[in-house]
Amino acid sequence: MTASTATETLLHKGSGLQVVVGLGQSGLSVAHYLAEQGYQVAVTDNQENPALANKLPATIDIRQFGAIDAELLQQAARIIISPGISLDNVAIAAARAANIPVVSDIQLFCEACTVPIVAITGSNAKSTVTTLVGQMAADAGINVGVGGNIGVPALSLLSNKEMELAVIELSSFQLETVTNLGAQVATVLNMSPDHLDRHGDMLGYHQAKHRIFQGAKSVVINREDALTRPLVSDSLPRLSTGIHAPNKGHYGLITDTAGQTYLARGTERLISADKLKIKGRHNLLNAQAALALGELAGLPLEIMLITLQQFAGLEHRCQYVSTVAGIDYFNDSKGTNIGSTMAAVEGLGAVYAPKDGKLLLILGGQGKGQQFGELSPFINQYVSQVLFIGEDGKQIEQHLRAAGLSDEVSLHQCQTLENAFATIEQVTASSLSQVQAVLLSPACASFDQFDGFVARGEHFSQLVKQLDVVS
């Protein structure tokens, strides 16, 4: 362990020492914020030489690296924990047992923020909806800050003194230490199993997510997912979203006699789904969520609809790549859990099913102990070919077969994306092929073969472009 000041000389907790645990981007933002506020700050991190240590303010000379310093934590007036640090960490648990407050950067942000907050969480689509709402606000001429789990630390937004609205994406890790967020509008977009190794079970995960509703002035609810419904007063303003025709004032979908689907608010048809650049039923829910959040934040509907029509989605999130030889290719490399892949398969599958089209699905990577059999009903309905890649490809195939995968679905062990594309050319060359779209939505982490989901998605897109050149 390295330290520029011995633990024995540190201040006692009654004197206001603020200890930042974890020196990632959020921890660094906390350190700068607290130092600027005039606090005495200490930083501790498990890494011996944290990459961001040289970016700490010079005034912070208490730096305990190599392990989280339990003795240092016991001397804190307040501990600010980074999202990657579990509350079950021995040193953190001991500090909490000693009644030392443990909070996150989000707690500091909501206490300091003086503008309305749009708070967004969910198992999937958080970044898409957060980005979309932020763009809607910007297009409406509002000075908006967008941050949180989306890559920009929330505290850094406070440097914009002209900010009129904050739109923040929140993870369950960030929320588990937040009390009374007080958002102008809050939502849990959807809920599916994720991070259970951290939260223990779905109950713990659900409880963490729903902390977003504490102190909220209004809420948005997904009618299709009972787990998103908050336990809040019936008098609290709320809007809901769903895949069916909505009640008056709420959002949903209306399909006319010709089979055309529209985003709707009550009986009012707002925009045809065909006019949107983002595709799939799940993206229609995302679009509704953004509209509902924007409405409760005071954004004008006409501006939001213009933004929505222009919005092309985010990279690696059901991103349309190209059409080659009549087949559409979609990059959903960010789909690193089964819930995300379910949404992508169902969402895109419903687009091609009316045209008797099927999906070719690329699955695999590091499975994280998930039960992939839950994908079988979705694959049976919308997929004709499954190509497996990565270290857990064979295990995923076993899960699907054991869960009643249809014999009509062809399975291929490909190991790599290069092999997968060779297989794609073979299976789609047949005149009997029903494949109208290829979807990379691995439902797995990527670190067995790539530096991350971005690298995996970029490689997929490059292989598609090579196909395009050849064709």
Curated annotation (Swiss-Prot):
**Which EC numbers characterise this protein's activity in its record?**
6.3.2.9
**First-listed, main subcellular location of the protein, grouped into a coarse class:** cytoplasm
Source taxon at top rank: Bacteria
Question: What GO CC terms are in its UniProt record?
Answer: cytoplasm
Q: Where in the cell is it found?
A: Cytoplasm
**Catalytic activity, per the record?**
UDP-N-acetyl-alpha-D-muramoyl-L-alanine + D-glutamate + ATP = UDP-N-acetyl-alpha-D-muramoyl-L-alanyl-D-glutamate + ADP + phosphate + H(+)
Pathway it works in: Cell wall biogenesis; peptidoglycan biosynthesis
Q: Name one GO biological process term.
A: cell division
Q: Name one GO molecular function term.
A: ATP binding
- Group of enzyme by EC: ligase
Provide this UniProt record's keywords sorted from A to Z: ATP-binding, Cell cycle, Cell division, Cell shape, Cell wall biogenesis/degradation, Cytoplasm, Ligase, Nucleotide-binding, Peptidoglycan synthesis
Q: Which residues bind ATP?
A: 122-128
InterPro entries per UniProt: Mur-like_cat_sf (IPR036565), Mur_ligase_C (IPR004101), Mur_ligase_C_dom_sf (IPR036615), Mur_ligase_cen (IPR013221), MurD (IPR005762)
Which Pfam families does this chain map to?
Mur_ligase_C (PF02875), Mur_ligase_M (PF08245), MurD-like_N (PF21799)
Q: What is the stated purpose of this protein?
A: Cell wall formation. Catalyzes the addition of glutamate to the nucleotide precursor UDP-N-acetylmuramoyl-L-alanine (UMA).
Family, similarity comment: Belongs to the MurCDEF family.
Query: Do you know which HAMAP family this protein is assigned to?
Result: MurD
The cross-references to NCBIfam families, in alphabetical order and at most eight, read: murD
Query: What protein is this chain from?
Result: UDP-N-acetylmuramoylalanine--D-glutamate ligase
Q: Which organism is it from?
A: Psychrobacter cryohalolentis (strain ATCC BAA-1226 / DSM 17306 / VKM B-2378 / K5)
Q: What is the lineage of its organism?
A: Bacteria, Pseudomonadati, Pseudomonadota, Gammaproteobacteria, Moraxellales
